[in-house]
Design a protein with these regions (language model features):
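Short loop/turn motifs at secondary-structure junctions
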Residues: 79, 94, 125-127, 148
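Acetyl-CoA-dependent GNAT
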Residues: 11-12, 19-92, 96, 101-102, ...
């Protein structure tokens, strides 16, 4: 296994922000609950196996650089993981996108990207990070929990009237 280096993506390496999305296994759903001012969750596992893949974005470094920061996980000169952070008016930096090339999954690269994102947030006056994951992307949801995020909200309406109807968004926060 080669050493993966996390670095900020700059204009000279801006092509790295368009690494391809790759398929991921959908094996269950996170079900949040809110009682007495506290969030909790249960997990419902799927019967059978299914896969999904988000459409590729066509990010423009030039258009996004003003209010976004890009961190790349690099194996030599090849970007194999990406975290995109968006500046916010409130005290949480938004983890806008997080992805790792499928051949590199299981090597804690997402954890390293989250860790560097959190350091960046703190160094820039934020009190932490926030992000969103679909409830049926259980691997992502559990990864956020395992990386110190907590549930802070749940949107059951966002996908109504779309091909994703029945899915919901879970809001995750990681505090100082």
């Amino acid at each position: 296994m080669s050493e993966i280096i996390i670095r900020e993506i700059t204009e000279s390496t801006s092509d790295d922000i368009n690494i391809k999305n790759e398929r991921f296994k959908k094996f269950g759903k996170m079900i949040p609950s809110y009682q007495n001012g506290k969030w909790d969750y249960t997990v419902s596992e799927n019967e059978g196996e299914s896969w999904d893949c988000f459409p590729d974005e066509n990010y423009s470094f030039e258009k996004m650089a003003k209010d976004h920061v890009f961190l790349g996980a690099c194996d030599g000169s090849v970007c194999v993981g990406l975290a995109i952070l968006r500046h916010q008016w409130h005290k949480y930096l938004y983890l806008y996108d997080l992805k790792v090339n499928s051949a590199y999954r299981g090597q804690h690269i997402a954890t390293d990207l989250i860790s560097e994102s959190f350091k960046y947030a703190l160094a820039n006056g934020y009190r932490g990070l926030w992000t969103i994951a679909q409830d049926n992307n259980l691997a992502a949801c559990l990864s956020y929990i395992n990386n110190g995020f907590r549930i802070g909200g749940f949107d059951t309406e966002v996908y109504n009237g779309t091909s994703l109807e029945g899915s919901a968004d879970i809001y995750f926060y990681k505090d100082v």
